[in-house]
Amino acid sequence: MCIRDRDHTVPVFLKISPNLGYEQIDDVLDIVSTQKVDGLIATNTTITRDGLSATDHQIKQIGNGGLSGLPLKDRALEVVSYIRSKDQKIPIIGVGGICEPQHAIDMLQAGANLVQVYSGLIYSGPSLVKKINKAILSSSLN
């Protein structure tokens, strides 16, 4: 938090793993409330391979590393919703599995203040951002 001590204009957000359990998320929320963290980014990539259609052999061939994209969506929504149920004020950037406009709306409805896309851009291209913005503007969130 050295940068926060030097310059209070730089927002600091903590990115958390979708692999955390609810007790661990509670611990993170306790720490965030005392350490001048401005918000949370929920979630990072996952190390689990649950719910994939690939065979065990294919998964072993792919190797280790963080999994992102659509397989992360449901857990990311759960984490965002859980955080919002525990803290109504903390800013949350919802990340994970946002591959189409409805996914962004779902993330906002779960309690995120902002959404971040990355894998969705790879599969849908940069027009995804425009589509998300249009969907939000025409939704009940606006």
Outline where the language-model segments fall.
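Glycine-rich phosphate-binding active-site loops on the catalytic face of alpha/beta enzymes
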Residues: 39-47, 97-98, 104-131
